[in-house]
């Protein structure tokens, strides 16, 4: 689905690699959008996000798997790119816990320690994996 060879695709690839947060928007029971920043890893095909099991985003995904994600408009290098993904979210019961995923630990170990938690404690607290497969991407660079 993603062409990483175009100018837009290269910007997407850069953001997937370098951004610390992505904004996840779910839809609540009243049909209202509910955005929140989340930690993520991109596995080449989908976003993987970890959540506390009773978080609203988990309930929202179970009731309506249609979600969107977007990056902040300006990245750390000052680039002003707009990238918005639409996708299908699901609870991934087969995902390894966060502390057993090298890519997740490379990216967020310092942040986890900043929460006064060990990686294993983080994985126990944020034990629900949400996988999001993009169905559409739009924006401009």
Residues of each region from the PLM?
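Charged, gly/pro-rich active-site loop segments
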Residues: 1-7, 81-141
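Short, surface-exposed beta-strand-loop junctions and turns on beta-sheet-rich folds
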Residues: 55-57, 76
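Short beta-strand segments
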Residues: 19-53, 61, 68-72, 84
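A short, aromatic/hydrophobic, helix- or strand-capping loop or linear motif
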Residues: 27-28, 72-76, 111-120
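Alpha-helix boundary recognition
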Residues: 16-17, 62-63, 123
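A solvent-exposed, acidic/Ser-Thr-rich amphipathic alpha-helical stretch
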Residues: 45, 78-79
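Short, basic/aromatic recognition patches
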Residues: 1-22
